[in-house]
Amino acid sequence: MTQDEMKKAAGWAALQYVKKDTIVGVGTGSTVNHFIDALATMKDDIEGAVSSSEASTKKLIELGIEVFDLNSVDLIDVYVDGADEINDRMDMIKGGGAALTREKIVAAVAKRFICIVDNTKQVPILGEFPLPVEVIPMARSYVARELVKLGGDPVYRQGVITDNGNVILDVYNMKILDPKVMETKINAIVGVVTNGLFANRGADVLLVGTPDGVNTITL
């Protein structure tokens, strides 16, 4: 089974957590695109979706799924999204696609967070994948200096502007032993919008695509 086939298996497995007549939170990325394809098969049974990115919104609309503004929604039953890394405590690094802030907002509103990945994303310690940090443009250099003080090696992601009009610093060489503490520390830096650690609000269910099928992990 190829990596993309494992992603597809995880994406389709998430459909079992979608209830009829609900609004579904939809993340961003290659694995989520498989989930959106699956969600389209029951588009007449759900109210619609809230999307975390312009890219996912475009795909949802193309497949005939109504997309709601989050401000018009009180509650999202489930939020389905991928991860760049996830540990055994369901802490994640996300944001490789630069949609981390909107992903974090939608996750905060959702009752349950279903994380869908292939088995290459499971790690014992977060940090081998560079940690994305969304930053107000005028604060980029200051935030970079502060991230160095925290032990990281920040690199400006050239040519990338987020859906919110901000920039991304990718922080390399951080072995993140306490994700909750590090998430809070980075978010406290003036000029940071948010960072790609999802630890204070981690996943509730992890669906892992493997060569032998999909493994379901809960805490």
From Swiss-Prot:
Known InterPro entries for this protein?
A: NagB/RpiA_transferase-like (IPR037171), Ribose5P_isomerase_typA_subgr (IPR020672), Ribose5P_isomerase_type_A (IPR004788)
Q: Does the keyword Isomerase apply?
A: yes
Q: Which reaction does it catalyse?
A: aldehydo-D-ribose 5-phosphate = D-ribulose 5-phosphate
Under the heading SUPFAM superfamilies, the entry gives: D-ribose-5-phosphate isomerase (RpiA), lid domain, NagB/RpiA/CoA transferase-like
Coiled-coil annotated residue ranges, if any: none
Q: Could you say which EC number(s) this protein's record lists?
A: 5.3.1.6
Taxonomic superkingdom: Bacteria
Extract the Pfam families matched here: Rib_5-P_isom_A
Q: Which family does it belong to?
A: Belongs to the ribose 5-phosphate isomerase family.
Q: What does this protein do?
A: Catalyzes the reversible conversion of ribose-5-phosphate to ribulose 5-phosphate.
Share what the entry says about its subunit structure, partners included: Homodimer.
Instruction: Give the protein name, as stated in the record.
Output: Ribose-5-phosphate isomerase A
